[in-house]
Curated annotation (Swiss-Prot):
Keywords associated with the record: Cytoplasm, Flavoprotein, FMN, NAD, Oxidoreductase, Pyrimidine biosynthesis
SUPFAM superfamilies: FMN-linked oxidoreductases
Enzyme class, UniProt record, top EC level: oxidoreductase
Function, as annotated: Catalyzes the conversion of dihydroorotate to orotate with NAD(+) as electron acceptor.
Cofactor descriptive note: Binds 1 FMN per subunit.
Keyword set includes Oxidoreductase: yes
EC annotation from Swiss-Prot or TrEMBL: 1.3.1.14
InterPro entries tied to this protein: Aldolase_TIM (IPR013785), DHO_dehydrogenase (IPR050074), DHOD_1B (IPR033888), Dihydroorotate_DH_1 (IPR024920), Dihydroorotate_DH_1_2 (IPR012135), Dihydroorotate_DH_cat (IPR005720), Dihydroorotate_DH_CS (IPR001295), Dihydroorotate_DH_I (IPR049622)
Organism phylogeny: Bacteria, Bacillati, Bacillota, Bacilli, Bacillales
Subcellular location: Cytoplasm
Organism of this sequence: Bacillus mycoides (strain KBAB4)
Designated name of the protein: Dihydroorotate dehydrogenase B (NAD(+)), catalytic subunit
One GO CC annotation: cytoplasm
Pathway: Pyrimidine metabolism; UMP biosynthesis via de novo pathway; orotate from (S)-dihydroorotate (NAD(+) route): step 1/1
Amino acid sequence: MNRLQVELPGLSLKNPIIPASGCFGFGREYAQFYDLSVLGSIMIKATTEQPRYGNPTPRVAETPGGMLNAIGLQNPGLEKVMNSELPFLEQFDLPIIANVAGSQAEDYVAVAKAISKAPNVHALELNISCPNVKTGGIAFGTNPEIAADLTKRVKEVSEVPVYVKLSPNVANIVEIAKAIENAGADGLTMINTLLGMRLDLKTAKPILANRTGGLSGPAIKPVALRMVHEVSQAVNIPIIGMGGIETAEDVIEFFYAGASAVAVGTANFIDPFVCPTIIEELPALLDELGFDHISECQGRSWKQTCHSR
C-alpha cells in the first residue's frame, strides 16, 4: 500500500508533495539535482499567451521569516511552453499542473484552451491572485462575481480539471471560494502571497522597484493554515494547501486544516532537495502520529469523525 497516494480530480498523485508555481520554474534546474518523478506533481510557472519580461529590478527582498517578490509573471509565453518546456517534462512520470495567467479574461481562456490539450497536463491552476502585476492577476481574485465568471469561462474550454488559486488579500476568502466552487471549479489552491513592502533605511524608499511585493515563506504559514481551515469547511471540492511549508510536520498541519495535498514554494530556494526530503520523512511521521495513510489526517482539526488507529 502506498501510504502517501492521493487521488484528486484529474490527478493521481503518488504522494501529496507538489513544488509550487513560481518557485520551481519548469523543473529544468531542479532536474539536475534529483529525479523529478519522485514528486507528486509539478505546478509549472505561470504561462501567459505572450512572453512577459516581468517587473523591473530589484524585484526580490529578504524579510524575517520569508521573502518579498515582485517578479511580475515573467515567462516565455504559451508557444515556447507548449513546444519546449512541457515536452521536456514528458520524460518524468508525473502529472503536470499548468498555471494559467493573463491580463484579461480572453487571455486566460486562450491559454487554458491550448495548454489543456498538452498530453502531460492533467489539470490547470487558474492564477487569479498574483499581487505583482498592473492588470489582471489579483483583480480577478478579489471579487466573487468576477472570479466566478472567469472560472466558468475557463471551465467551458478546458479539457482537464480546473483548480483556482485564491488570494489571501481579501476580506472574506470563504465567500470567494464558494462562488468559485459554484462556478464549476474542480478544486482550489491556497494561498497565494500576502501583499507587503520593505523600505530602505537610507533613502526611505521602497526596496522593490514595484514598491510592493508578495510575501511568502514561513511567516505566512499561520495565515495560510487559518484560511485553509475556514475554506475547507465551507466547500466540497479539494484544496491544495500552500504557504510556508518547509517540513513533513508542516504538511501534516495543512492536512489537519483540511488540505488534500500541498505545494512547497519558497523553501525550494533555500534547499533544492526540500521536496524529496519531505516525501522521505512523511512515512515515519505518520507512524509516530498513529496513521496508516495520510488521508486519515485530512480535516482532522474540524472533522469529529476522524480518528487515528
